[in-house]
Amino acid sequence: MDFEDDYTHSACRNTYQGFNGMDRDYGPGSYGGMDRDYGHGSYGGQRSMDSYLNQSYGMDNHSGGGGGSRFGPYESYDSRSSLGGRDLYRSGYGFNEPEQSRFGGSYGGRFESSYRNSLDSFGGRNQGGSSWEAPYSRSKLRPGFMEDRGRENYSSYSSFSSPHMKPAPVGSRGRGTPAYPESTFGSRNYDAFGGPSTGRGRGRGHMGDFGSIHRPGIVVDYQNKSTNVTVAAARGIKRKMMQPFNKPSGTFIKKPKLAKPMEKISLSKSPTKTDPKNEEEEKRRIEARREKQRRRREKNSEKYGDGYRMAFTCSFCKFRTFEEKDIELHLESSSHQETLDHIQKQTKFDKVVMEFLHECMVNKFKKTSIRKQQTNNQTEVVKIIEKDVMEGVTADDHMMKVETVHCSACSVYIPALHSSVQQHLKSPDHIKGKQAYKEQIKRESVLTATSILNNPIVKARYERFVKGENPFEIQDHSQDQQIEGDEEDEEKIDEPIEEEEDEDEEEEAEEVGEVEEVEEVEEVREGGIEGEGNIEGVGEGGEVGVVGEVEGVGKVEEVEEETAKEEPADFPVEQPEEN
């Protein structure tokens, strides 16, 4: 320190002499471009070099305030000089005050040089004054802090030589609360060294915080504000900290989907056959449902053409073909039986139920055959569709119609060329995709079967099937009406389902629904079918639900919700794991 002392003495002496000729204004001064009124004639004007040197080197060789000039050459403003006859070397840390003394008074004895110098090495004393005291302590904005009572600041930030590097001073308690409300940003906090931040303000007891953390940048006048403000500020910070955790929980609450279906189910069970209001509501619901089906049919007709309704489909296996032989072979194939076995394994249905589900697919095939026979002008319709497809296309557009092969497993269209098809069959994407698609079909087949059995029309049919009757005989005397209904049902299914198979299934389900909807729904509600009896009427009504499920679980759920409105979901079907 000898070299540093000599160097500092000479540098400061020169600086002080240079400033002697300058007019010093100890009133309101400007520091860093900001006008500040420091009250008791505190340091103003250009900040002298000695304040920087005192900060950097922590000079403590001279106790300012007693020389001929008000400020010694090696110190900035020392608040103790304005306090009267106090000991200049009394503890600025407040250790000599009775209510706060813990170490036996001031730095007398062995603490006079060693301990104080060790603290001064951090540049915080400035001859007992605070490195932040001069520019910050007497601000107009803090009238409550005008009374300096000797508790000067010692901060871990004071070692920064440049005032611009210092964060806004705050107290030792964190959250913007100064430790000395009656003084400046108080209390010579040296908790950065792990020691006690002495002085929590007069009347607050002499217990200091240990190891508290500074939170610079938050300034609050706690002398002029009530304690509620302090609490509000702290609480505001807590709220901000907690918000990120509340948001995910809020979104998580929206997850449960069982609430809506349960409400619908309870509403569907409550109405009775004799209640006219419920009947009117049921009619309105049916009309709204049919209107949706019509719109879906129009949409699907534009998308796929009218020919899609002429295809034979298996709702469980997602199989589609335009040839009767192909569908007959499929219904007798091992793959179709494997799908039914998977459904039985997942849902634990009885054999009677599985036979009924199979008969529903057979009946669907028969209905499509009848529709084809009645549509004698099918070829003409196809030609018209072809014209519509190429409408507006001219030679200048260089467009032509070609055939393509659609791969459902990969969701791609392949040119109808032998080489292209063979190349796709051998591609790794197709080999991997077909396995995943097969598993997807199995999962969706369970949902399809469940939704079919939850349909009230299907439940009524199942009851007749269990009794040994033919549940599909009703269609014979009203085939025309049923066909129209089926078409509408198909529309409903087609809308949610991009695949044509699903659309056909829905058409059949709705077809049956229009013919028997009102009567069967009432019967089912009266009967209150339980157990397998709830499976009534799976036939065509079930197909509608099936189609929705073919495209995915989401679509299936939509179909189930619509059916739940009209039916009592009594069927004791064990939901598959996928659900």
From Swiss-Prot:
Ranges for region Mediates transcriptional activation: 1-124
Cell compartments where the protein resides: Nucleus matrix
Residues with the Phosphoserine modification: 48, 56, 63, 69, 81-82, 91, 106, 114, 118, 121, 137, 212, 249, 270
Sequence ranges of Gly residues compositional bias: 530-545
GO MF annotation list: DNA binding; RNA polymerase II complex binding; zinc ion binding
Biased composition (Acidic residues): 483-523
Record PTM Phosphothreonine, positions in chain: T251
Sequence intervals crossing the membrane: none
Disulfide cross-links: none
Region entry Disordered, spans: 154-194, 243-302, 472-579
Cross-link Glycyl lysine isopeptide (Lys-Gly) (interchain with G-Cter in SUMO2) placement: K140, K240, K247, K254, K264, K401, K459, K467
Stretches with biased composition (Basic and acidic residues): 272-290
GO cellular component, one term: DBIRD complex
Superkingdom of origin organism: Eukaryota
Chain span(s) of sequence motif Bipartite nuclear localization signal: 238-260
An example Gene Ontology biological process: RNA splicing
Zinc finger C2H2 AKAP95-type: from-to: 314-336, 407-430
N6-acetyllysine modified-residue sites: K247
Function: Core component of the DBIRD complex, a multiprotein complex that acts at the interface between core mRNP particles and RNA polymerase II (RNAPII) and integrates transcript elongation with the regulation of alternative splicing: the DBIRD complex affects local transcript elongation rates and alternative splicing of a large set of exons embedded in (A + T)-rich DNA regions. May play a role in neuronal differentiation and is able to bind DNA and activate expression in vitro.
Subunit structure: Component of the DBIRD complex. Interacts with CCAR2; the interaction is direct.
Protein name, per record: DBIRD complex subunit ZNF326
Organism for this UniProt entry: Pongo abelii
Gene name, Swiss-Prot/TrEMBL: ZNF326
